[in-house]
A protein has these predicted regions:
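Short, small/polar-rich motifs associated with maturation and membrane association
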Residues: 1-297, 303, 308-310, 314, ...
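Glycine-rich phosphate/pyrophosphate-binding loops
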Residues: 75, 85, 274, 788-808
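Active-site phosphate-binding and catalytic loops of NTP-dependent enzymes
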Residues: 77-81, 153, 548-556, 882-884
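Surface-exposed loop/interface segments of Gram-negative outer-membrane beta-barrel transport/assembly proteins
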Residues: 103-104, 109, 173-244, 284-291, ...
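Residues on the lipid-exposed face of transmembrane beta-strands in outer-membrane beta-barrel proteins
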Residues: 168, 180, 262-266, 296-302, ...
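Transmembrane beta-strand segments that form the barrel wall of outer-membrane beta-barrel proteins
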Residues: 182, 277-283, 517-526, 683
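Conserved C-terminal beta-signal and adjacent last beta-strands/turns
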Residues: 263, 692, 773-801, 854-903, ...
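Repeated loop/turn-to-beta-strand initiation elements of outer-membrane beta-barrel proteins
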Residues: 270-273, 306-309, 393-396, 450-453, ...
Length: 938
């Protein structure tokens, strides 16, 4: 008898030479779904969840959790405002479910909810610091994304936006295994990000603008207008003696990264262990941008008698160097890189940096030498769990988890910088997040003939404390920048905490592994709400029918090898993001008219209550000839009692400008609906060659269904939040092309009459209208994995169709002409496409004229359709007969590349995987990375 894990046992006759080919056992290899409150076979799971393929986690070297998920899970979308190493990414599961209370999913590590999001909220960089960047992705065993209420409702108020369940590696019974992994690589921009005209092309364009100014504003003759342009062009586009300056080349560089990890695992029938240590160093594509990380992880499980104890400990230290990027803060380097004129010279004749050059009067090379933004994070996540096996069907467990994170952010503008003059400014922000979780669970699993029951009761507490200290010093007498050396200092402290107490239960029943029923209930009490509204109840009911086992399908079972219909309905909730929104808040330390006092910084709303998410899902799982599997889900998600920060009058007594003049109200409703499709196939499989393919696609429709009942829209710049429309809709004048006689921009009237599609060059006659939305119509990914003998190849494409973005920054270049004439010019301003004179009917861009202001219109609306080679990995495993003599069980070398190719609209000058509202500013673009590595197992 010959057997192997995951293979069917076979009996063979004993002979001198025997050749045996074991067949896979689909039941043993069946995919499981880890929910945090239990592990289920996918065949018996009644909800909607996706699990990332184990080989994807193991073989593809990436540095973030988001990169592990990208392109592999239907219905999960990603956005980022920066590719600064360690920066925050936004992850959305089935759209957005809130306005002000947060849209990020709940992250659960080894069964415990953890702190997530941006920890460095008081810095001057758009990048932020993702607390999950402290997690070593090589320690991850599996990732499951829970999308509907069937399992998510057990997490109650924290899971309205989905749950990402991360299971870290643990020891396995068998000999001790030592694994070493190391990789190195480099990175650059994934696309030609915001290309600019070179010096000569820019000079030609500006000369044309000056001439047109003379012709159409100065009423000059053609010859006089040309002379006028010749006389003034040197003021705007003079060529330096050292040649044109390429600011993009000066401010950006190739990034690099290196990663080293050593892990040891093993165990016996009583004790299992896994431990690892890792070091990561990543340099960004902007000088002084990078991340350095040390991590340690230990997981120990020990059985004694009727007890089992499990201890996990994760520690990390992260040092993140950031650079200011967009337009909202002082010294934004990425902003400068695309605004500086090629006529500006960064260096003086003696080789020193030339301070004061450029459109903003700031030399970005000078600023970066005299400023810094460094964030240091210390994080520890420790758990201990004791399980008592009361009898073989009944278990009682108690778990305590402590999640600790402390960060220190040092921001410096020294005495020589423009922002720090004359004496320098240093700011230090120290923030701390503590979270203590306790979980008590009683679980019961039993079978009675064809009846199978899996039930759980639980009690949980969560205590969270957040504190920060802000200290600032200025007027330094020298170049030693510590707070104690400052001529003057200021400080501010804050501490806040909240508690949540929860009772929960679930029961799953199935008959003959054919008919399934699931029930769950949870009630949460949160100190973020007034006593009258403190408790919220969340529940779900789900069912499934595994119809493949019905006799009437016997004739087609040779083709249809599995089939299951699923349905679920449930209610989740979201609590306010503010800890004390229901209370009146005051702040001391305010100076008014030379007297100390206090100010109002929060207006109470004791009626504030939970947001409610009501979700239903219907799904179908099919398998054909044991090679092709299809999963289809349709869902509808309605959010009511939306928490919205309603503006209030400042006359009421608000004094401190650091706090918004708003009060939270439950005033709105949102609706998300859509479908998800995943098709997985084993295209070919024999003893030497295997080829599998997975395709996923998703559509989500998001609409705002209610505001406060009195107004039906809120306008914010080019965005509008209007009832009946997607939340991120663009509301501007509709561009109608170029007037052939005057060369001016034309706009559609959109006045609601029969003249709506008539055009005008007078923008005051036109009306704004919704011209697009950021939400894509279809998004998804395509993954192929091939293995031939000792060579493996995997690649993933991601794609998106039907969305729009608003290129705010290209419009800024044209605003009043001042940026164009003082700084850089985007290649968008193609002189060959511009109006040349009366009767020009071929122009797609209006007349270019000095001082002319371009209007905020759909001219700046760009399609976000794209297809991207998200990842490609090629590995070679050295055959066992070569490495066994060296004491190795595995030796693999590999190459991996991410964002290698991107196909997108030529009109989109930024990366298509952008921030969630689609407003394009100046961020560090997505990176194309090349990684070379080696993996050794002993």
């Amino acid at each position: 008898m010959i057997s192997f894990v995951g293979m069917q046992t076979q009996e063979v006759t004993i002979k001198p030479h025997v050749k045996v080919i074991l067949k896979s056992d689909s039941e043993l290899l069946e995919e499981v779904v880890v929910t945090g409150y239990g592990t289920f076979k996918k065949a018996s799971f009644t909800g909607a969840a996706s699990t990332v393929n184990t080989s994807t986690l193991e073989d593809v070297p990436v540095l973030s959790v988001a990169d592990k998920l990208s392109g592999n899970v239907a219905g999960v979308t990603f956005g980022s405002s920066s590719s600064n190493p360690g920066s925050v990414s936004s992850i959305r599961v089935r759209g957005m479910g809130s306005i002000n209370a947060g849209n990020n999913p709940l992250y659960v590590i080894d069964g415990t909810p953890v702190t997530s999001g941006d920890l460095s909220e008081f810095t001057y960089s758009d990048a932020g610091t993702d607390i999950l960047s402290s997690l070593n992705t090589n320690d991850i065993e599996s990732i499951t994304v829970i999308k509907d209420a069937a399992a998510a409702s057990l997490y109650g108020s924290r899971a309205a936006n989905g749950v990402v369940v991360i299971t870290t590696k643990s020891g396995k019974q068998g000999k001790t295994n030592v694994s070493f992994r190391s990789d190195w690589g480099f990175s650059n921009m994934a696309i030609d990000y915001r290309p600019m005209l070179d010096g000569d092309s820019r000079r030609e364009l500006l000369w044309t603008g000056l001439k047109n100014y003379g012709l159409y504003t100065g009423n000059m003759s053609d010859a006089d207008a040309a002379t006028f342009a010749d006389q003034n062009i040197e003021d705007f586009a003079s060529k330096p003696s050292t040649g044109w300056t390429d600011w993009k080349d000066l401010l950006f560089r190739n990034g690099s990264h290196q990663n080293y990890q050593l892990s040891v695992s093993g165990g016996n029938d009583r004790t299992k262990f896994y431990t690892s240590a890792a070091y990561t160093n990543q340099e960004g594509i902007i000088y002084k941008q990078g991340l350095e990380r040390f991590t340690g992880n230990a997981n120990l499980t020990h059985k004694f008698g009727d007890f089992e104890v499990q201890v996990t400990s994760q520690f990390s230290k992260v040092r993140q160097n950031k650079t200011n990027e967009a337009t909202s803060y002082d010294g934004p380097v990425a902003n400068y890189a695309f605004f500086q004129s090629p006529s500006s010279t960064p260096y003086n004749e003696d080789g020193t940096l030339n301070n004061g050059c450029g459109v903003f009067g700031v030399n970005p090379l000078y600023e970066r030498e005299h400023s810094s933004d460094v964030y240091t994070l210390m994080k520890a996540f420790n758990t201990i769990k004791l399980t008592y096996n009361i009898w073989d069907k009944l278990n009682l467990s108690e778990k305590i988890a402590y999640d600790y994170a402390q960060g220190t952010n040092d921001v410096l503008w020294d005495r020589h910088s423009n922002n720090g003059a004359p004496g320098g400014v240093m700011q230090r922000i120290v923030n701390r997040n503590d979270q203590l979780n306790t979980q008590t669970q009683l679980s019961y699993i039993n079978s009675f003939g064809l009846h199978n029951i899996d039930a759980l009761l639980g009690f949980e507490t969560q205590d969270t404390e957040y504190a920060f200290n802000y200290m600032a010093g200025q007027d330094y007498p020298g170049d030693l920048y510590e707070l104690t050396n400052a001529g003057s200092t200021s400080a501010e402290t804050n501490r806040q905490s909240y508690r949540m107490t929860s009772f929960l239960g679930r029961a799953n029943y199935n008959y003959a592994d054919r008919y399934y029923l699931g029930l769950s209930y949870r009630t949460d009490g949160s100190s973020r709400l007034a006593r009258e509204n403190r408790w919220g109840s969340f529940w779900s009911v789900s069912g499934a029918w595994r119809f493949i086992d019905e006799s009437f399908l016997n004739p087609v079972k040779n083709v249809l090898t599995d089939g299951k219909l699923r349905m679920s309905y449930g209610v989740n909730g979201t609590q306010p993001s503010d800890y004390y929104a229901y209370m009146n808040l005051y702040k001391y330390g305010i100076i008014y008219n030379g007297q100390s006092g206090m100010s109002i910084v929060g207006i109470a709303n004791p009626d504030l209550k939970w947001e409610k998410n009501k979700t239903w899902n219907i799904g179908l799982d099919l398998s054909f000839i044991d090679r092709i599997s299809v999963t289809f889900d349709y869902y509808q998600r309605k959010t009511s009692d939306l928490i919205y920060d309603l503006p209030v009058s400042q006359v009421g007594g608000y004094y401190d400008g650091n706090y918004g003049y708003t009060t939270p109200q439950n005033i709105g409703s949102l609706k998300n609906s859509g479908f998800e499709l995943t098709i997985t196939s084993t295209n070919f499989r024999n003893k030497d060659f295997t080829w599998t393919t997975s395709l996923n696609m998703a559509h989500n429709s998001n609409k705002l269904t209610k505001l406060d009942g009195q107004q039906n829209e809120i306008v914010s710049g080019p965005l509008i939040h209007r009832v009946g429309e997607p939340y991120y809709s663009y509301y501007v004048y509709e561009y109608a092309g170029v007037d052939a006689e005057t060369g001016k921009e034309m706009f559609y009237l959109n006045d609601g009459t029969e003249n709506a599609r008539k055009t005008t060059t007078n923008i005051s006659e036109a009306n704004k209208t919704i011209v697009g939305k950021h939400q894509a119509s279809i998004e998804g990914g395509l993954t192929n994995n091939l293995k031939w003998k000792f060579i493996d190849l995997g690649f993933t494409f991601t794609y998106s169709l039907g969305g729009d973005a608003f290129d705010y920054s290209t419009w800024q270049h044209s605003n009043g002409g001042s940026y164009l004439y003082g700084g850089a010019v985007p290649t968008y301003y193609d002189i060959s496409k511009m109006w040349t004179g009366p009767g020009d009917t071929n122009a797609t861009l209006p007349k270019f004229e000095y001082g002319s202001a371009a209007s905020l219109s759909s001219r700046w609306l760009m399609p976000t359709d794209y297809l991207r080679l998200k990842n490609l990995t090629l590995g070679v495993s050295i055959p066992q007969n070569y490495i066994s003599k060296l004491g190795l069980s595995k030796a693999r070398i590999y190459f991996s590349g991410s964002n290698l190719l991107t196909w997108k609209s030529k009109d989109l000058f930024v990366d298509p995987e952008m921030r969630v509202d689609g407003l394009c500013t100046f961020e560090t673009p997505a990176l194309r990375t090349y990684t070379f590595g080696i993996e050794l197992n002993f």
